[in-house]
């Protein structure tokens, strides 16, 4: 089921993410869940803890909302950049739609889809007609870049649940894309040759041969990384949720789908927990805590083989390096409610 590191004499899973820090072989860590449950705060905090015990860590946001810049109060882009105050923790934010646009729209920076010739436009239409191709290309480009940068551990702050799970199918998506393009080029080869110059150039200056070579390179990279994703020594997925029905439902669906893809998951972070003091006269707090406890009990019963980390609801936003560092401590040292 999982490779969580626990002592043989333990009769339960530790309620922390310490096992992830201890598992030195891990290279890819995904943090995902329903929107608004604290994925970004959790992924940033986990990255901070990992940076203490790893040579180099890269945090990548694949969520179009791009909250990393907000979390660290520092602007990030599509190039990896060191986070202020760290010498071994970098971050980057990628546009899920950007990579395929770059690949298909020609070489010039100002060349958009509107400048493309008929065949180039047809290629773009074909590419976008394949479900999930935008995310697939985006991740392929990132993975290619990550490979050349040789970070010890890479953490993905993923888009909300549906997008995350769709991304995990991207190796087969790209395989299908390449098959379709190859089929078209064989079917319409003579026709395409009429449009192309002697060096394979389309009317808009695009080079079809170069584009096909680039796709093939990406496919090889994706195939290699896909094998790593299914290796529990190298990859794990951290589920983030809050103690409410919809979030619990999404988490269960996600864990089942991760299992079907062969991707390891053995950690759940439950955010926004209320801990009213005994005898508190706050009726709303007590009522909400009762509801939360019902779902928290279900989580602990359903996932008794998981590291379930309980994180408190805080009185202020977790933004900036200092607050994130403080929050991150609770991922490795269980929170003790004030008595």
UniProtKB/Swiss-Prot annotation:
Drop me one GO molecular function for this one.
Answer: guanyl-nucleotide exchange factor activity
What is the official name of this protein in its record?
ATPase get3
* SUPFAM superfamilies hit by this protein: P-loop containing nucleoside triphosphate hydrolases
The answer to whether the entry has keyword Endoplasmic reticulum is: yes
Task: Give the transmembrane region(s).
Answer: none
Subcellular location per UniProt equals: Cytoplasm; Endoplasmic reticulum
How does this polypeptide assemble, per the annotation? Homodimer.
- Kindly give the InterPro entries that the UniProt entry links to this protein: Anion-transp_ATPase-like_dom, ATPase_ArsA/GET3, ATPase_ArsA/GET3_euk, P-loop_NTPase
Q: Does the keyword Amino-acid biosynthesis apply?
A: no
Regarding protein family, the annotation reads: Belongs to the arsA ATPase family.
Question: GO CC terms for this protein?
Answer: GET complex
Q: What is its EC number?
A: 3.6.-.-
Main localization category: cytoplasm
- Provide the active-site residues from the annotation: 63
Q: Which PANTHER family match?
A: ARSENICAL PUMP-DRIVING ATPASE ARSENITE-TRANSLOCATING ATPASE, ATPASE GET3
What keywords were assigned to this record? ATP-binding, Cytoplasm, Endoplasmic reticulum, Hydrolase, Metal-binding, Nucleotide-binding, Transport, Zinc
From the broadest rank down, the organism's phylogenetic lineage runs: Eukaryota, Fungi, Dikarya, Ascomycota, Pezizomycotina
Q: Which residues bind Zn(2+)?
A: 282, 285
Pfam families, per the entry: ArsA_ATPase
Task: Outline what the protein does.
Answer: ATPase required for the post-translational delivery of tail-anchored (TA) proteins to the endoplasmic reticulum. Recognizes and selectively binds the transmembrane domain of TA proteins in the cytosol. This complex then targets to the endoplasmic reticulum by membrane-bound receptors, where the tail-anchored protein is released for insertion. This process is regulated by ATP binding and hydrolysis. ATP binding drives the homodimer towards the closed dimer state, facilitating recognition of newly synthesized TA membrane proteins. ATP hydrolysis is required for insertion.
């Amino acid at each position: 089921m999982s490779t969580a590191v626990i002592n043989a004499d333990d009769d339960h899973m530790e309620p922390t993410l310490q096992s992830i820090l201890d598992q030195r072989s891990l290279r890819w860590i995904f943090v995902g869940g329903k929107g608004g449950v604290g994925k970004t705060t959790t992924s940033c905090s986990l990255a901070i803890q990992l940076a203490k015990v790893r040579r180099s860590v890269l945090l990548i946001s694949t969520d179009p909302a791009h909250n990393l810049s907000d979390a660290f109060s520092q602007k990030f882009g599509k190039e990896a950049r060191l986070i202020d105050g760290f010498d071994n923790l970098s971050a980057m934010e990628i546009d899920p739609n950007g990579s395929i646009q770059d690949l298909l729209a020609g070489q010039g920076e100002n060349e958009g889809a509107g400048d493309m010739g008929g065949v180039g436009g047809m290629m773009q239409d074909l590419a976008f007609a394949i479900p999930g191709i935008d995310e697939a290309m985006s991740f392929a480009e990132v993975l290619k870049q990550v490979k050349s940068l040789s970070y010890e551990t890479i953490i993905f702050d993923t888009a909300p649940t549906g997008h995350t799970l769709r991304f995990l199918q991207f190796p087969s998506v790209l395989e299908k894309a390449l098959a379709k393009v190859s089929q078209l080029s064989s079917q319409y080869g003579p026709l395409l040759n009429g449009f192309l110059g002697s060096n394979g150039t389309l009317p808009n200056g695009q080079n079809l041969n170069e584009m096909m070579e680039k796709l093939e390179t990406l496919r090889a990279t994706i195939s290699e990384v896909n094998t790593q994703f299914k290796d529990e020594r190298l990859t794990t997925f951290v589920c983030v949720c809050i103690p409410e029905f919809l979030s619990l439902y999404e988490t269960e669906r996600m864990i089942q789908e991760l299992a079907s893809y062969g991707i390891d998951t053995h950690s759940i972070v439950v955010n926004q927990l209320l801990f009213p003091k005994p005898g508190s006269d706050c009726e709303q707090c007590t009522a909400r805590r009762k509801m939360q406890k019902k779902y928290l009990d279900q989580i602990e019963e359903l996932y008794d083989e998981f590291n379930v980390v309980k994180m408190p609801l805080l009185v202020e936003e977790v933004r900036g390096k200092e607050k994130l560092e403080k929050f991150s401590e609770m991922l490795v040292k269980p929170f003790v409610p004030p008595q």
